[in-house]
């Protein structure tokens, strides 16, 4: 099974991707995490990508496509995966379908209001050890400064997240991705979830779509 999670930054794709992947025993591939890892390297490619991220602009298709193709054609993903953050536009979708059959794909779109997106993104942080995602407004650890999952007390706050950049990312996302939504609507494998709901309700809705018990 190949599942694509579509939605703007802050829609909850990463949180749900990890949870659903664990339930159906498939890897969760977060494109944003892949590129943040690349940015930490001391390469000219990392510097180039980092410049796009700081401006809130999308990384060019040719860079994204080649990086993702290398990942997806790895043998560890031969049985399927949950793909979070790709494709982002029609060009990427068509490139994706050049090596993945469209009939194998289920697409789930996370629909959520802009105001809530901004609040979610500005408030989110994660455990540096296990990657568990938290939010200062909606989801804090049960014990202050201690991760619920691994008990680490080291957290990672996204330095590229500020309100101006987030607003630009949302607008860029709409311009680039809305035509992709129309493209997938006619596929017969396109579903919409109300991502303004709480975390458990969203998970339940996705499980129904994927027919997970």
From Swiss-Prot:
Region (NMP): 30-59
Compartment annotation: Cytoplasm
GO cellular component annotations of the record: cytoplasm
Pathway(s) this gene product operates in, as recorded in its UniProt entry: Purine metabolism; AMP biosynthesis via salvage pathway; AMP from ADP: step 1/1
GO biological process terms, semicolon-separated: AMP salvage
Binding site for ATP: 10-15, 124, 133-134, 197
CDD domains, per database record: ADK
SUPFAM superfamilies linked: P-loop containing nucleoside triphosphate hydrolases
Binding positions (AMP): 36, 57-59, 85-88, 92, 158, 169
Domain of life: Bacteria
Residues the record lists as binding Zn(2+): 127, 130, 147, 150
EC number in record: 2.7.4.3
Catalytic activities: AMP + ATP = 2 ADP
Main location: cytoplasm
Domain text: Consists of three domains, a large central CORE domain and two small peripheral domains, NMPbind and LID, which undergo movements during catalysis. The LID domain closes over the site of phosphoryl transfer upon ATP binding. Assembling and dissambling the active center during each catalytic cycle provides an effective means to prevent ATP hydrolysis. Some bacteria have evolved a zinc-coordinating structure that stabilizes the LID domain.
Subunit annotation: Monomer.
Entry protein name: Adenylate kinase
Organism for this UniProt entry: Rickettsia typhi (strain ATCC VR-144 / Wilmington)
Record lineage: Bacteria, Pseudomonadati, Pseudomonadota, Alphaproteobacteria, Rickettsiales
Gene: adk
